[in-house]
Regions:
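Compositionally biased terminal segments of proteins
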Residues: 1-199
């Protein structure tokens, strides 16, 4: 069943960590919850919860969540069942999921593109890094590295994204700030409001 897109009862961070604790693939918390793990405290409400998995681990992901209902955003903005054995090609980035007995969406999974031992951003092909460097533990939970998470938030620049950026800005290391500035220049050649604050 495809629920209304606004019907969410998201897992908690602890529940996500327990679900994937022994998974045979790398995963990391993403979105606003990843920001809060970096900060070490909650700063706002959340409608959903997101994780990332490398695209080439998708079959292992499917097997790991064999007791769940999985739906691919294909095309983006439209959900359809993700069938067993189906390979989700580039262009299909998001998976929505719920346990078979649930009555609302519980988890969103985003697939990260790879090129050999590198991860590659959808924002710009020159924005990339070692796969081993993308996910880092913040307060014992694997998360998307904060500067990368902020890059993804920069596109929408919604009020919640602005709040997340402002909360993280004083805590960014010099290297993280420099990386984010360079990535924003590539992804937003027309300019971005955050660049002046990262100078």
């Amino acid at each position: 069943m495809i629920f209304p897109y606004t019907r969410w009862t998201p897992l908690s961070v602890a529940e996500v960590a327990a679900l994937f604790r022994d998974a045979p693939f790398r995963w990391g918390l993403a979105g606003g919850y990843a920001v809060e793990q970096f900060l070490g405290m909650p700063i706002r409400a959340h409608d959903d919860i997101d994780i990332v998995v490398f695209r080439d681990d998708q079959h292992q992901l499917y097997q790991w969540l064999h007791a769940w209902r999985l739906f691919a955003a294909d095309p983006p903005g439209t959900l359809r069942p993700w069938n067993q054995g189906e390979w989700l090609a580039p262009g299909i980035h998001d998976i929505w999921a719920y346990e078979r007995t649930a009555h609302a969406w519980q988890l969103q999974i985003m697939l990260i593109e790879t090129d050999g031992d590198m991860w590659v951003s959808r924002r710009h092909p020159m924005i990339r890094g070692l796969r081993t460097d993308l996910l880092v533990p913040y307060h014992q939970i694997p998360c998307v590295r904060i500067e990368v998470q902020l890059l993804y938030k920069a596109k929408g620049n919604r009020p919640k994204d602005q709040l997340d950026f402002q909360a993280c800005l004083p805590l960014l290391t010099r290297d993280a700030s420099a990386w984010l500035r360079q990535a924003l220049q590539l992804a937003h050649p027309e300019g971005h409001a955050w660049l002046a604050l990262l100078a």
